[in-house]
């Protein structure tokens, strides 16, 4: 148990059995009336963001979320199997928990898996990953380094937009949060 005065960004709260991450908070002391804490909370499971106000000093339940570095090993049916980098335990993670980051995961990808009561909550990848372009239309005469984009398929099967000069077989850096092309990878 903690009070609203102890809130910090990144904390996970258990409010009515639902887990929420504190994204932002502000202590407010108006000239008249009692102080309060205005928070922005993000639902851990759905990603929904809400604003919530608490009276200053009230008790809130802080959930224990264990963030572990794990290695993605393979698909087992629908589940993704991760191995804990410290204990070498293997944990199956359902596709709903992995979410959109599955588009950027290859075998042996290092990821952070958040666990609450030994149940996986979400999977986070680094901000960018390096992947190979498996298919894209060839560039044509006159393509420049600036200008338009074209669709390309990554080795994971995900589709992204890349500049016209990128060819099949090139390694590119991709933002895992929104799937944007960030640049070529030079060896």
Curated annotation (Swiss-Prot):
Subcellular location: Cytoplasm
UniProt keyword Nucleotide-binding present: no
Example GO BP: peptide biosynthetic process
Main location: cytoplasm
A GO cellular component annotation in the UniProt record: cytoplasm
Pathway field: Protein biosynthesis; polypeptide chain elongation
GO MF annotation, one: translation elongation factor activity
UniProt entry tagged with the keyword Electron transport: no
Alphabetical keyword list: Cytoplasm, Elongation factor, Protein biosynthesis
A Pfam family of this chain: EFP
Family as reported in the entry's similarity comment: Belongs to the elongation factor P family.
Function description: Involved in peptide bond synthesis. Stimulates efficient translation and peptide-bond synthesis on native or reconstituted 70S ribosomes in vitro. Probably functions indirectly by altering the affinity of the ribosome for aminoacyl-tRNA, thus increasing their reactivity as acceptors for peptidyl transferase.
Protein name according to UniProt: Elongation factor P
Naturally occurring in which organism (per UniProt): Parafrankia sp. (strain EAN1pec)
Biological classification of the source: Bacteria, Bacillati, Actinomycetota, Actinomycetes, Frankiales
